């Protein structure tokens, strides 16, 4: 059987109005992946003219977005010769950050869209830094709106240089920088004849070369639980996605923080595993599975618990413990001070956490300390902080298990900050 093409998740990032939506629209339009209903509407109108058709389609997509219907994520799958690509989050989503950290939407790569007319803008920096914080290791740069600078090579080189500086400072290496016009369709899917000075890949070709994400099978087993079901004749079936490690029938697993909270090990032997109603002998990272554990009841575990092997159980941070984290403040109306207690979202858990100490403020671009023990931190700041959970939760240092070490901080219905765990300080 031929090996299936790898699936790759990408996000589009970049400053507002630099053309993220148009670029996505052009990719879908030129690969014939625009939602049926929209194409049908267009054909019913019997309109002429190709460039007009793209403009019309973009207007419809925009209307749908403004009515709160973001292009259904199911439509944003498309194929390249060697990859299945899913655009997991289009721009403009309020919950973009939270989705990226807690959802099924760990991105493998980001497309950073920068307008040739403006160059690097504040949000360009913020989004690039965020991609870094969220552990996106592969980036593709699209310098858009080349039609508005007359496809000028000098202008392209100037903006490319700015972007290069920014990304190298954040530790990115080897990223393609592609001059495109999403509106005119240059170098998105089809090679442009208007920029003979450029001989690199089109955006689609660059997407086709995204490295296949490695599966973290050698890391300790971690399965954050999404739901718990009781199934007649089977028993209790926790459901979740394997983040790291491998689960096999016959393994002995323990659930945390359930075991810590109940002061007794909630553990047992794995009797069966299934995915999409098919029985499995073993499950790997990325697999969404249901599994049954001998002796574990429906009321013993819940969403937010994490399963791991008893030989290397999930790390629990209790209210008497603290953890050190690096955060970037994305959106706070005033300022964050010691004592602030918002809700932390990581994998499938949500726990209120208290800011115990503000250790240092960092330069978001270089990571260097600019101020020790600041009195407060505000939107745009990056900082090292000490956090204390109000109840026991599982979280891991990002260096050990990156999939379990990233989090979003939410308050007042919005994502206030994003961060990663540096280390855990146990009280005993």
From Swiss-Prot:
GO terms for cellular component: cytoplasm. The keyword Phosphoprotein does not apply. The gene is tuf. Residues 144-147 are annotated as: G4. The keyword GTP-binding applies. Residues 181-183 are annotated as: G5. Belongs to the TRAFAC class translation factor GTPase superfamily. Classic translation factor GTPase family. EF-Tu/EF-1A subfamily. Residues 5-215 form the tr-type G domain. One of its GO terms (molecular function) is GTPase activity. Residues 68-72 are annotated as: G2. It is found in: Cytoplasm. InterPro entries: EFTu-like_2, G_TR_CS, GTP-eEF1A_C, P-loop_NTPase, Small_GTP-bd, T_Tr_GTP-bd_dom, TRAFAC_GTPase_members, Transl_B-barrel_sf. This is Elongation factor 1-alpha. Residues 14-21 are annotated as: G1. GTP hydrolase that promotes the GTP-dependent binding of aminoacyl-tRNA to the A-site of ribosomes during protein biosynthesis. Its main location: cytoplasm. GTP binds at residues 14-21, 89-93, 144-147. It comes from Thermococcus kodakarensis (strain ATCC BAA-918 / JCM 12380 / KOD1) (Pyrococcus kodakaraensis (strain KOD1)).
């Amino acid at each position: 059987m031929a090996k299936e093409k790898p699936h790759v998740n990408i996000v589009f990032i970049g400053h507002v109005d630099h053309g993220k939506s148009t670029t996505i629209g052009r990719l879908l339009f030129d690969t014939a992946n625009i939602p049926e209903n929209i194409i049908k509407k267009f054909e019913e109108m019997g309109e002429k003219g190709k460039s007009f058709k793209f403009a019309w389609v973009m207007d419809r997509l925009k209307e749908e977005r403004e009515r709160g219907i973001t292009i259904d994520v199911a439509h944003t799958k498309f194929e390249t010769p060697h990859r299945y690509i899913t655009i997991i989050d289009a721009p403009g989503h309020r919950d973009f950050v939270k989705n990226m950290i807690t959802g099924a939407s760990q991105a493998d790569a980001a497309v950073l869209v920068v307008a040739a007319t403006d160059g690097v803008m504040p949000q360009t920096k913020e989004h690039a830094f965020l991609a870094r914080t969220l552990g996106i290791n592969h980036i593709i740069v699209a310098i858009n709106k080349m039609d508005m600078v007359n496809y000028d090579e000098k202008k392209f080189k100037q903006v490319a240089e700015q972007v290069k500086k920014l990304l190298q400072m954040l530790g990115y290496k080897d990223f393609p920088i592609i001059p495109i016009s999403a509106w005119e369709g240059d170098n998105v899917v089809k090679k442009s004849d208007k920029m003979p000075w450029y001989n690199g890949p089109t955006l689609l070709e660059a997407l086709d070369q995204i490295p296949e994400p490695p599966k973290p099978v050698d890391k300790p087993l971690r399965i954050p639980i999404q739901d718990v079901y009781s199934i007649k004749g089977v028993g209790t079936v926790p459901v979740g996605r394997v983040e790291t490690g491998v689960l096999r029938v016959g393994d002995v697993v323990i659930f945390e923080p359930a075991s810590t909270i109940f002061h007794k090990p909630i553990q047992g032997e794995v009797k069966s595993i299934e995915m999409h109603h098919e029985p499995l002998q073993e499950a790997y990272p990325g697999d969404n599975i249901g599994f049954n554990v001998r002796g574990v009841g429906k009321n013993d575990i819940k969403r937010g618990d994490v399963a791991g092997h008893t030989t290397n159980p999930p790390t629990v941070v209790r209210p008497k413990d603290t953890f050190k984290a690096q955060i970037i403040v994305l959106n706070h109306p005033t300022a964050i001070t010691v004592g602030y207690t918002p809700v932390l979202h990581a994998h499938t858990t949500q726990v209120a956490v208290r800011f115990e100490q503000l250790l240092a403020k960092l330069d978001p671009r270089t990571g260097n300390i600019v101020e020790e023990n600041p009195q407060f931190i505000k939107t745009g700041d990056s900082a090292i902080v000490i956090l204390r959970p109000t109840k026991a939760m599982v979280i891991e240092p990002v260096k050990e298990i990156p999939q379990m070490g990233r989090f979003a901080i939410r308050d007042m219905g919005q994502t206030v900050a994003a961060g990663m765990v540096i280390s855990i300080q146990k009280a005993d």
